[in-house]
Amino acid sequence: MIKIYAPASIGNVGVGFDILGAAIIPVNGSLLGDFVTVKLSNKFNLVNKGIFSNKLPKNTEQNIVWKCWLKFCNTIKRNIPVSIILEKNMPIGSGLGSSACSIVATLVAMNEFCDKPLNSKELLLLMGEVEGEISGSIHYDNVAPCYLGGLQLILEDSKIISQTIPNFKNWFWIVAWPGTKVPTAEARDILPKKYKKETCIKNSRYLAGFIHASYSQQPHLAARLMQDFIAEPYRIKLLPNYLYVKEKIKKIGAISSGISGSGPTIFSISDNINTAQKISAWLTENYLQNTTGFVHICFLDSKGVRKIG
C-alpha cells in the first residue's frame, strides 16, 4: 500500500500569470491538500472520500484519478490493476490547485507503487498533460509547486520545466476561499486573446523585478512588485467586492494581495503574525459566503508531495 499527500498551491502568485506557483501549508501544522492511497487489486477500483467527495463526478471515467491512472498505464505500457482511494479535501474550482492535488498525488502514488518507472521530469510532464486536458491548456503553475514544493518559476523548456525560487521565510500567506466556485476554463475564457505591448512590457518588468528581489532577499521590493496586469483586471468581474476586500486588507496591514489562480480564493501576505491574524479574522467575517468557506494562515511548503504511508 502507498499513501501520498499533495499540498494546495497558489497559482500565478500575482505577478506571474502561468509562470509562478507556490505550495502552501498552514502554520498550525495541519495538511491542506488531497490524499491518494493505492493498493493492489484484481481490477481498477476507485473510492472517493473526503470533505468534497460529493462534488466529484459520479462516472468513474470522468474522475481525474481515473484519467491519471489510464495515462500512467499507457505511458509505461502496462495495465496496473489497483484499488485507489481519493481523499478529496480540496474544494473544486477554488483557485487553490484542487485538480493539481489529485493529479500529483495519483501519479506519484502510481509511480511509487510500480517502483518508479518514470523519473521526476517525466512525471511532471505527465502532470502538465493531464492538467491541460482538464483546464484546456497545459500549465504547470499548480502541478509544479504541488509536486516540487516551494515557489516555482515555470520555464517549460524541453530540458528544464521548472526552477525553485528563493522565498521569504518571515512571510505569512493568508488564503481565503469564500465557499464558491470559479471554473478554470471560465476564468481563462474571460481573458483577452491579445494584449497591448505596453501591458506586456510592464508585466515583464514587474516579474523580472520580483525574481531579482527574491534572489537578493529584498522582501519589501518583492511585495511591491507582486501586481497582476494580465488576469486580475478581467477576473475581478467573477469576484464580487474583490477591490473593496483588497483595499480593506491593505489597510489592516497586508504588504501584498491578489487572486489565487483563477479564484475565487484570494491570498494576502504579511510579515507579522499579529497582522496576519487580524487579516484572517477580517476575511473570515467579511469574505466567506457560506459555512464551507475557510481561511488559513500559511507558510510556503518546501516539501511538496510526500509519502505518508
Swiss-Prot record:
The keyword ATP-binding applies. Pathway: Amino-acid biosynthesis; L-threonine biosynthesis; L-threonine from L-aspartate: step 4/5. One of its GO terms (molecular function) is ATP binding. InterPro entries: GHMP_kinase_C_dom (IPR013750), GHMP_kinase_C_sf (IPR036554), GHMP_kinase_N_dom (IPR006204), GHMP_knse_ATP-bd_CS (IPR006203), Homoserine_kinase (IPR000870), Ribosomal_Su5_D2-typ_SF (IPR020568), Ribsml_uS5_D2-typ_fold_subgr (IPR014721). It catalyses: L-homoserine + ATP = O-phospho-L-homoserine + ADP + H(+). Its EC number is 2.7.1.39. It holds the Pfam family GHMP_kinases_N. It is found in: Cytoplasm. Keywords: Amino-acid biosynthesis, ATP-binding, Cytoplasm, Kinase, Nucleotide-binding, Threonine biosynthesis, Transferase. One of its GO terms (biological process) is threonine biosynthetic process. GO terms for cellular component: cytoplasm. SUPFAM superfamilies: GHMP Kinase, C-terminal domain, Ribosomal protein S5 domain 2-like. Disulfide bonds: none annotated. It is an enzyme of class 2 (transferase). The keyword Disulfide bond does not apply. ATP binds at residues 91-101. Catalyzes the ATP-dependent phosphorylation of L-homoserine to L-homoserine phosphate. Belongs to the GHMP kinase family. Homoserine kinase subfamily. HAMAP family: Homoser_kinase. NCBIfam families: PRK01212.1-4, thrB. This is Homoserine kinase. It comes from Buchnera aphidicola subsp. Acyrthosiphon pisum (strain APS).
